Amino acid sequence: RSLICSAEVNKAIHAGAQNKHIPSSKGYIEGRSYLFGDLEGAQALVERYAGTGTAVLTRKGDWANKEIILSDEVIGAAVDLETGKAEETKKFVIHYGKSGAHIVPAKEG
């Protein structure tokens, strides 16, 4: 958690990766889980929730550069890859990388 909150982890939104999950953007990929809002909204979610969720670990116990968050409000929709059905969700995963972070809405439960 302290690593996620530190300056070592890039928390700026990576526009290219995030736009794949914003339906109003040119980069949106049909069938992906999507975020309500825009890049600024995604950045606000990272700033608010970074370091507050559950870190995802590899089998070896190393941090997988991901964090699972359950927010107070609906942030987007998780799309079932098999059925294509979208369900509103408060759960999301922040993916952290050298080039920045992006958010992927996830199915609750």
Question: Model segments located where?
Answer:
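Functional cores of ribonucleases/endoribonucleases
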Residues: 1-109
